Amino acid sequence: MVFWKRFFNPDSTSSPSLGPTGAEEFPTDNGDKARIFFTTERDIDLYELEELCDAVGWARRPIRKVKKAVECSFLVVTMWEMQGNRRRLVGFARATSDHAFNATVWDVVIHPSLQSKGLGKALMQYIIRKLRHYDISNITLFADPQVVDFYRRLGFVLDPEGIKGMFWYPD
């Protein structure tokens, strides 16, 4: 398991700084007055989350099921763009877990206007760091083909040690 020791080396990732009210701030270089904050608050406007998912072209899911998924997740991470007193949800990810060994990251999304600026990487580093804080050592995710290389650059591997993910779908 040399891979995991290298993957979880604390020197291998940079950390966002603390922002107001305990949220973590990610510096932006876009020249405007916006700042980006990460939080683990679960109290989010589900319709705002739906708008974020719509912006990237995801299929709509029933709000009641999204609410349940957020409530039952082990960890929820939100990313907010702050301009003055106005905040806008611009990123989201969540993880389910057995609370001991394993976690799976789901629903990683960054608003299209902020993609390719390092925010997806920062969001993933943040959620990995939080999961490692809880001593979770096996972190998995499912990726669409067009983002596999993104996750590879973060240290995720396909089929580590020959392990295959399997799915069961109802008829």
Curated annotation (Swiss-Prot):
Tell whether Secreted is among the UniProt keywords: no
One Pfam family it belongs to = Acetyltransf_1
Does the keyword field hold Transferase?
A: yes
Which GO terms label this protein's molecular function in UniProt? N-acetyltransferase activity
InterPro entries hit by this protein: Acyl_CoA_acyltransferase, GNAT_dom, NSI-like
What EC number(s) is this enzyme filed under? Answer: 2.3.1.-
What are the annotated GO cellular component locations? cytoplasm
Domain (N-acetyltransferase): residue spans on this chain: 36-171
Q: Which UniProt keywords apply?
A: Acyltransferase, Transferase
PANTHER family, A to Z: ACYL-COA N-ACYLTRANSFERASE, GCN5-RELATED N-ACETYLTRANSFERASE 2, CHLOROPLASTIC
Which family is annotated? Belongs to the acetyltransferase family. Ycf52 subfamily.
Name used for this protein in its record: Uncharacterized N-acetyltransferase ycf52-like
Organism listed in the record? Synechocystis sp. (strain ATCC 27184 / PCC 6803 / Kazusa)
Q: What is the lineage of its organism?
A: Bacteria, Bacillati, Cyanobacteriota, Cyanophyceae, Synechococcales
